[in-house]
């Protein structure tokens, strides 16, 4: 190896590149990771500066007349809504709903570049709306959390004010230890809380349809208020219940004050009902709209399959959450309480008696082993069960014939009744007069009510469960109504499901048959067939006496009777010859007495032999209108 050359000063000079030793190779498995954490924020900050200066912006957003420019790449990465608009649809100008506040949207747009969001407490709902429309869920979650915290602080403030500075009506001494507060203070606090609750709940909020949080709010405020005003006078039953007479510190009753607090807490309740004063019960405050008689819905505690009365309010507060999903609904008709022997009515005055009939209870949540069956809005009579008693009942199989199968003793049959279009049950009562006549030989007398004829809308629809008998006649060949097992909500019964479905279409005003020429719609197929004759111009019915043609069969029948009568009385008439085309005369079975005013024998004797023709189908003329013309006799 040659020594490196020396400089005039004696220092070694660097070797040329070609003479430098090669660098040591790095191991093949070695990977060098270098991180630049400030690049991300610097990149977004640079993009935000370009947005503010209007540089390289390729999309515009309009909100209530204001236009904002931005980068489509940033919008697509920050919002699923913008991702669909700019990538899937390729839009360069986007108009947002007018429900959004332009100022709130401008702040949210800036947060997509900076990651920071500043908002006033009064504008949280506006930002929640913007986040919901743009599907920016991190903003929705944060606004929801802020609203929940604000509501909790407002609840604490109202509870403290109600417990310390409330004036009892009629007493001159304030109930709290503080100064005297006017009674309007409570009303203003209540209205303030109501307005805050209504403002903080927007349709786009994630907890807008969350009744549980509203329940927690109402329960906590009621419990705190009751603890401060009454002490230990609180009873829980799906929610706190205040006793009506409560004596304040000054000796005067504060019942009015407690009722006002109950109204305040009911505004955010779960909608299950209001508290009945003095009874400790809840009564429903909402009934679903329906064209049928309204029913009262009362939540009761699950009592298994036992028909004995059950308490209306859960007694154990620790089991309230478990029993909340095991509710039953008691349905009571107002105008049918006298007719139902086992019907019940919830006492408003707080009486201990509340007679509950198992036939009036419909299950909302079935046991896990039973499940909920698919219920048709028009149920057949084989779904009916007995109203009273628990003996085995035979049903009808799918083919319509009776089968000797019976219900299991552990699961008595549930009384399923016909439903109207809104899902309300139509009550069907057994006929007491026909129960004794339709009883089969050897049948116990106690089951007459469940095997008798069922009165539906004034018609008798035979026996519903006696093997081998329909309508009380052995052998299953009784009256014609015995085989009509398909019921409509209006009370009519049909022997075939297709007939019932066609009848239901009449109720629903469905017109499935369209005319291909004029687009008119018809409910029945034969109506369309008759209507098509008006487009073809065919007149298939021709009088055999005067050779006059008719389009409609009923018009032809009326004319034929009058024409034949005139021909018999006058003895003159144009009788068609052998070459005259004749239309279809009616069959012999339709030439019954009443046509022409006389009997059938007189008509045959008076009519000339040449005018009595054998019935033949009408002639068919083809018309080029896109469909085959025709339309013979029905």
From Swiss-Prot:
One of its GO terms (biological process) is regulation of transcription by RNA polymerase II. InterPro entries: BTB/POZ_dom, SKP1/BTB/POZ_sf, Znf_C2H2_sf, Znf_C2H2_type, ZnFinger_BTB_dom_contain. Disulfide bonds: none annotated. Signal peptide: none annotated. SUPFAM superfamilies: beta-beta-alpha zinc fingers, POZ domain. Residues 199-209 have a biased composition (Polar residues). The keyword S-adenosyl-L-methionine does not apply. Its main location: nucleus. Residues 180-198, 217-229, 452-461, 608-618 have a biased composition (Low complexity). PROSITE patterns: BTB, ZINC_FINGER_C2H2_1, ZINC_FINGER_C2H2_2. GO terms for cellular component: chromatin; nucleus. A zinc finger (C2H2-type) spans 486-507, 513-535, 541-562. The modification Phosphoserine is found at residue 202. Keywords: DNA-binding, Metal-binding, Nucleus, Phosphoprotein, Repeat, Transcription, Transcription regulation, Zinc, Zinc-finger. SMART domains: BTB (SM00225), ZnF_C2H2 (SM00355). Residues 57-121 form the BTB domain. Residues 167-247, 308-461, 568-634 are annotated as: Disordered. GO terms for molecular function: DNA binding; DNA-binding transcription factor activity, RNA polymerase II-specific; RNA polymerase II cis-regulatory region sequence-specific DNA binding; sequence-specific double-stranded DNA binding; zinc ion binding. It is found in: Nucleus. Residues 317-340 have a biased composition (Acidic residues). May be involved in transcriptional regulation. Belongs to the krueppel C2H2-type zinc-finger protein family. This is Zinc finger and BTB domain-containing protein 22.
């Amino acid at each position: 190896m040659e020594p490196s050359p020396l400089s005039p000063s004696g220092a070694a000079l660097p070797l040329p590149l070609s003479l430098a030793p090669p660098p040591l190779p790095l191991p093949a498995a070695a990977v060098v990771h270098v991180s630049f954490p400030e690049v991300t924020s610097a990149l977004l900050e640079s993009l935000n500066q370009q947005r503010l200066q209007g540089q390289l912006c390729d999309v515009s957003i309009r909100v209530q007349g204001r236009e904002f420019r931005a980068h489509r790449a940033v919008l697509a990465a920050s919002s699923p809504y913008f991702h669909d608009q700019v990538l899937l649809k390729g839009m360069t100008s986007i108009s947002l709903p007018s429900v959004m506040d332009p100022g709130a949207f401008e702040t949210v747009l800036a947060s997509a570049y900076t990651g920071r969001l500043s908002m006033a407490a009064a504008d949280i709902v506006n930002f929640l709306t913007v986040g919901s429309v743009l599907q920016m869920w991190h903003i929705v979650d944060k606004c929801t959390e802020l609203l929940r915290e604000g509501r909790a602080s407002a609840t604490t403030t109202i509870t403290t004010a109600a417990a310390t500075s409330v004036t009892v009506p009629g007493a001159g001494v304030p109930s709290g230890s503080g100064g005297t507060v006017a009674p309007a203070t409570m009303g203003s606090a209540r209205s303030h809380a109501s307005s805050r609750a209504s403002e903080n709940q927007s349709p786009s909020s994630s907890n807008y349809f969350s009744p549980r949080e509203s329940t927690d709010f109402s329960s906590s405020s009621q419990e705190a208020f009751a603890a401060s005003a009454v002490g230990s006078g609180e009873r829980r039953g799906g929610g706190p219940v205040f006793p009506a007479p409560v004596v304040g510190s000054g000796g005067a009753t504060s019942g009015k004050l407690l009722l006002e607090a109950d109204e305040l807490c009911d505004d955010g309740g779960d909608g299950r009902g209001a508290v009945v004063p003095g009874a400790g019960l809840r009564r429903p405050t909402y009934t679903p709209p329906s064209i049928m008689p309204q029913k009262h819905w009362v939540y009761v505690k699950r009592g298994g399959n036992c028909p004995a009365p059950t308490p209306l309010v859960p007694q154990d507060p620790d089991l309230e959450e478990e029993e909340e999903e095991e509710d039953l609904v008691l349905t009571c008709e107002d105008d049918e309480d006298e007719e139902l022997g086992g019907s019940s009515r919830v006492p408003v005055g707080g009486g201990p008696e509340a007679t509950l009939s198992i036939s009036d209870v419909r299950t909302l949540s079935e046991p896990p082993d039973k499940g909920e069956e698919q219920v048709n809005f028009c149920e057949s009579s084989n779904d009916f069960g007995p109203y009273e008693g628990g003996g085995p009942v035979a049903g009808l199989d799918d083919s319509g014939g009776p089968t000797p199968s019976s219900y299991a003793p552990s699961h008595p049959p549930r009384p399923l009744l016909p439903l109207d279009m809104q899902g309300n049950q139509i009550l069907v009562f057994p006929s007491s007069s026909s129960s004794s006549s339709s009883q089969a030989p050897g049948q116990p007398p106690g089951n007459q009510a469940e095997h008798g004829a069922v009165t539906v809308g004034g018609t008798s629809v035979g026996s519903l469960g006696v093997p081998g008998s329909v309508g009380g006649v052995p052998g299953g060949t009784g009256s014609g109504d015995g085989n009509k097992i398909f019921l409509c909500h209006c009370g009519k019964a049909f022997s075939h499901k297709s007939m019932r479905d066609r009848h239901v279409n009449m109720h629903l005003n469905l017109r499935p048959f369209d005319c291909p020429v004029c687009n008119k719609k018809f409910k029945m197929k034969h109506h369309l067939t008759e209507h098509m004759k008006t487009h073809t111009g065919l007149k298939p019915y021709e009088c055999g006496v005067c050779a006059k043609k008719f389009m409609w069969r009923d018009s032809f029948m009326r004319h034929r009777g009058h024409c034949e009568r005139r021909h018999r009385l006058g003895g003159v008439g144009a009788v068609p010859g052998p070459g005259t085309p004749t239309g279809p005369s009616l069959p012999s079975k339709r030439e019954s007495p009443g046509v022409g005013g006389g009997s059938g024998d007189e008509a045959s004797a008076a009519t000339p032999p040449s005018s009595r023709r054998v019935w033949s189908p009408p002639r068919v003329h083809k018309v080029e209108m896109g469909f085959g013309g025709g339309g013979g006799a029905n």
